[in-house]
């Protein structure tokens, strides 16, 4: 059954979604980044056009983003539209926002389970991947749990080649967070080039990492994504050859336990 709050919000946004009413819409949590929010009746997501399209946003990911940005009005609206309070609590546990959103009584789902759902949400489109990237890098509430979960995800069902382990090791040693490396890797793995360009613009020092990973998958689009000198490309190719020369092309994806043990013993 649809709640009274949801019905009221829907009626308000349908009748007042024009310029002179933006103050009211902001106050009710129906505006975000100067755009009016609508709940999609087809996919139950969130959009700016009041019609279903591939631009509809996942409510849970969107909820986490607005909480990180401390926009509690929009967070309340998304919760009333059915976004998961577990996600909200993950990002505001033991803070004033937790009480303001009244999610302190929500059952304490383990962070690792929620993070697993979060890190499996990147497949839908570039924007979903970028939201995940921003959340993992902006939030201060993950600490050790994030590192462990990202490590598990990388090792268990993403990595195809031992050379990838070495690449993560090299750049992790340069103090780039695992979550950042993970999202860059996913952008290449799932060919999300728009997201990849935006991420590397934020962290230009990760260009070589993107090259290395792209060459490992024989993905020449990664090269075309940036304006790079021949020297940079040549250097990356040489590093790939050197890494594969040391570790070979031994694939270990078929045995998750072995992959995890190998990673624990050698690279972390």
Curated annotation (Swiss-Prot):
Residue ranges of the TM segments: 176-193
Topology feature Extracellular, residues: 194-268
Signal peptide: none
Keywords carried by this UniProt record: Early protein, Host membrane, Membrane, Transmembrane, Transmembrane helix
UniProt superkingdom: Viruses
GO CC terms in record: host cell membrane; membrane
Main location: host cell
Cytoplasmic compartment segments: 1-175
Function as written in the Swiss-Prot or TrEMBL entry: Plays a role in virus cell tropism, and may be required for efficient virus replication in macrophages.
Protein name: Protein MGF 300-1L
Species of the source: African swine fever virus (isolate Tick/South Africa/Pretoriuskop Pr4/1996)
């Amino acid at each position: 059954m649809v709640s009274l709050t949801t019905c009221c919000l829907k009626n308000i946004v349908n009748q007042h979604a024009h310029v002179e009413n933006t103050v009211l819409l902001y106050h009710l949590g129906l505006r975000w980044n100067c755009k009016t929010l609508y709940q999609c009746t087809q996919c139950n997501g969130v959009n700016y056009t009041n019609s279903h399209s591939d631009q509809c946003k996942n409510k849970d990911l969107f909820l986490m983003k607005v909480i990180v940005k401390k926009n509690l009005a929009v967070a309340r609206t998304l919760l009333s539209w059915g976004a998961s309070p577990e996600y909200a609590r993950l990002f505001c546990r033991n803070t004033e926002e937790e009480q303001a959103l009244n999610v302190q009584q929500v059952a304490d789902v383990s962070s690792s389970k929620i993070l697993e759902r979060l890190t499996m949400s990147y497949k839908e489109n570039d924007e979903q991947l970028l939201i995940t990237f921003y959340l993992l890098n902006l939030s201060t509430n993950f600490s050790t749990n994030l590192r462990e979960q990202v490590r598990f995800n990388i090792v268990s069902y993403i990595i195809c080649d031992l050379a990838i382990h070495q690449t993560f090791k090299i750049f992790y040693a340069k103090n780039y967070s695992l979550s950042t490396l993970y999202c860059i890797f996913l952008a290449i793995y799932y060919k999300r080039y728009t997201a990849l360009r935006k991420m590397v613009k934020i962290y230009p020092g990760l260009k070589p990492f993107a090259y290395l990973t792209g060459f490992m998958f024989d993905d020449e689009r990664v090269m075309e994504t940036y304006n790079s000198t021949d020297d940079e490309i040549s250097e990356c190719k040489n590093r790939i050859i050197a890494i594969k020369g040391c570790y070979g092309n031994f694939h270990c994806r078929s045995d998750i336990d072995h992959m995890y043990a190998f990673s624990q013993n050698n690279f972390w």
